[in-house]
């Protein structure tokens, strides 16, 4: 059996999706955010370096503007996200302050990491914030990102963004929180005998083909984007855990080596019992 070894992990990127932050009613899950802030603050107190990639701007914006569903018009989507981003960061700042942890905001577009000069600048910004003991909270800059073919500003979703951030910050581990328990051998919502994959060492075509489907009603990322993110992590010689974000305290259990979720780590680097 493959044993998870995280004793040497210092820098961690945690990605939380909209479905983990927003209740099915559309209201903000305050308890979940408080638990997440507690866990991250606890890790910081233990000497870990944590970067949070947080979706949720659209969900927060819909709640504030009392809109029941995501608008289809691009300009309105950007407006809703812009309103929601301010509210989300305000709440994060308040809740993290309760645990005496300071946070900052970094909004990225894909062109920032494509061009060497801007990539160097944002990398230096991450390093400076981390050196100050601050938790950078990262999101895509939805108010200016566009999804057209002649533009290079949009990542696509925050699953991919979290993999990019893990790469440019040379993180030891990416923990992706979602509304699913991990990667299954088949769709668990359709097949009762679906089995959770505890460890994935290679992203095969079979895995890619089985990872169909879109994201939640408030978010954009589905299983395919998570698999693509894991592939990006592999290309950077990193590792990732995909796990259910229902209880953020499970992050601490994962770091203790407990086999929760799916661990993505290339086979040549895996240590055996």
UniProtKB/Swiss-Prot annotation:
Annotated Gene Ontology cellular component terms: cytosol
Pathway-wise, it operates in: Amino-acid biosynthesis; L-proline biosynthesis; L-glutamate 5-semialdehyde from L-glutamate: step 1/2
Residues annotated as binding substrate: 55, 142, 158
User: Which SUPFAM superfamilies did the record assign?
Assistant: Carbamate kinase-like
Catalysed reaction(s)?
L-glutamate + ATP = L-glutamyl 5-phosphate + ADP
Which residues does the annotation say bind ATP?
A: 15, 178-179, 220-226
Q: Where are the transmembrane segments?
A: none
* InterPro entries linked to this entry: AceGlu_kinase-like_sf (IPR036393), Asp/Glu/Uridylate_kinase (IPR001048), G5K_ProB (IPR041739), Glu/AcGlu_kinase (IPR001057), Glu_5kinase (IPR011529), Glu_5kinase/COase_Synthase (IPR005715), Glutamate_5-kinase_CS (IPR019797)
Q: Mention one GO molecular function.
A: glutamate 5-kinase activity
Q: Which family does it belong to?
A: Belongs to the glutamate 5-kinase family.
Name of the protein in question: Glutamate 5-kinase
Q: Which organism is it from?
A: Streptococcus pyogenes serotype M3 (strain ATCC BAA-595 / MGAS315)
Record gene name: proB
